[in-house]
C-alpha cells in the first residue's frame, strides 16, 4: 500500500469524500486499524487519560508522545501519522521546533498543536522548516483549566473568533485542522471557509474527516462518556468489524448523527 499523504486528504476534501481517522497508541492497534482501512492516525496526548490514567492530558511529556509514536509507526508504516505536541511543549516557536523534531524523528508525519492566532509565528516557523502542522480549535483539552472543564466552544460571538483563528492558522501554513466540540453550524462555516481539510470530533457530520479516541469507539472509556462518542464494538461484535463499521458510517455521513452533535 502506498503511504497516505496530506495531498490525498486534500483530494478527498475537493471531491467531498469524507474520511475516518482514529487515535492509536501502540503497535497492535495501529496494525489492526491499518489492516481494516484507516490510513490516518493520531498519537494524541489523550493517552494521558486513556493509557496512563491521569484526569487530564497535562502530565503527558514529549518523551511519552515519542515513545507511542514509534510504536504506532511500526504497526502502521504507511499511515499518515499525526502526533500531538503536549502541554507546554510549544510555548515559544523555538521550543516547538525542538520538540517537533523529536516526534518527527520518532515517526510522525505531522505535529498537532492546540490554539488560535497566537500560534501564527509558531506555525510559520515549523512549516518553513519542513514540519507539517495540524491546528486544533474549539475544545482544546490542554486549556481545560482555563475553560473550567470540558465544555462546548464557539457559541455566539466566540464562533467568529474561532473562524478567524482557523483562517489565521491556514494562512500561516497549517495543512490540517481539528475542530472539537463546536456547534454543527460553526463547523460547517469553518469547513467551507478553509481550503485545508477539517477533521471533526463533536462537530457534527459536516467536516471533511472524523476522528474518535479509540477507547470511545470500542466503548471502553472509563467515567464520563462524551455525547459525540459511539460504541461501535457493541453493534459490530468484534474489533475489526467495529473499525469497518466506523469507517463506513463516517464515509456515508451516518456518523456522527444528530444525537452526537451540538447546536
UniProtKB/Swiss-Prot annotation:
- What cofactor is this protein dependent on? Mg(2+)
Molecular function terms from GO:
3-methyl-2-oxobutanoate hydroxymethyltransferase activity; magnesium ion binding
Catalytic center residues = 180 (proton acceptor)
Pathway note = Cofactor biosynthesis; (R)-pantothenate biosynthesis; (R)-pantoate from 3-methyl-2-oxobutanoate: step 1/2
- Assembly behavior: Homodecamer; pentamer of dimers.
Its family? Belongs to the PanB family.
The protein in question is named: 3-methyl-2-oxobutanoate hydroxymethyltransferase
Amino acid at each position: 500500500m502506498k503511504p497516505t499523504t496530506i495531498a490525498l486528504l486534500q483530494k478527498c476534501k475537493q471531491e467531498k469524500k469524507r474520511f475516518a481517522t482514529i487515535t492509536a497508541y501502540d503497535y497492535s492497534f495501529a496494525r489492526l486499524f491499518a489492516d481494516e482501512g484507516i490510513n490516518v492516525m493520531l498519537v494524541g496526548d489523550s493517552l494521558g487519560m486513556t493509557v496512563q490514567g491521569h484526569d487530564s492530558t497535562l502530565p503527558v511529556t514529549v518523551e511519552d508522545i515519542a515513545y507511542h509514536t514509534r510504536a504506532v509507526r511500526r504497526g502502521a508504516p504507511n499511515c499518515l501519522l499525526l502526533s500531538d505536541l503536549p502541554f507546554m511543549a510549544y510555548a515559544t516557536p523555538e521550543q516547538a521546533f525542538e520538540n517537533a523534531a523529536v516526534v518527527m524523528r520518532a515517526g510522525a508525519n505531522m505535529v498537532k498543536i492546540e490554539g488560535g492566532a497566537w500560534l501564527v509565528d509558531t506555525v510559520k516557523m515549523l512549516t518553513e522548516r519542513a514540519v507539517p502542522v495540524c491546528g486544533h480549535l474549539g475544545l482544546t483539552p490542554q486549556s481545560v483549566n482555563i475553560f473550567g472543564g470540558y465544555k462546548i466552544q464557539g457559541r455566539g460571538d466566540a464562533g467568529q473568533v474561532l473562524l478567524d483563528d482557523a483562517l489565521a492558522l491556514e494562512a500561516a501554513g497549517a495543512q490540517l485542522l481539528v475542530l472539537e466540540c463546536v456547534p454543527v453550524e460553526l463547523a460547517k462555516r469553518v469547513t467551507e471557509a478553509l481550503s485545508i481539510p477539517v477533521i471533526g470530533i463533536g462537530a457534527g457530520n459536516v467536516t471533511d474527516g472524523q476522528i474518535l479516541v479509540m477507547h470511545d469507539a470500542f466503548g471502553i472509556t472509563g467515567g464520563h462518556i462524551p455525547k459525540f462518542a459511539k460504541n461501535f464494538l457493541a453493534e459490530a461484535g468484534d474489533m475489526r468489524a467495529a473499525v469497518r463499521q466506523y469507517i463506513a458510517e463516517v464515509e456515508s455521513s451516518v456518523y456522527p448523527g444528530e444525537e452526537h452533535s451540538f447546536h
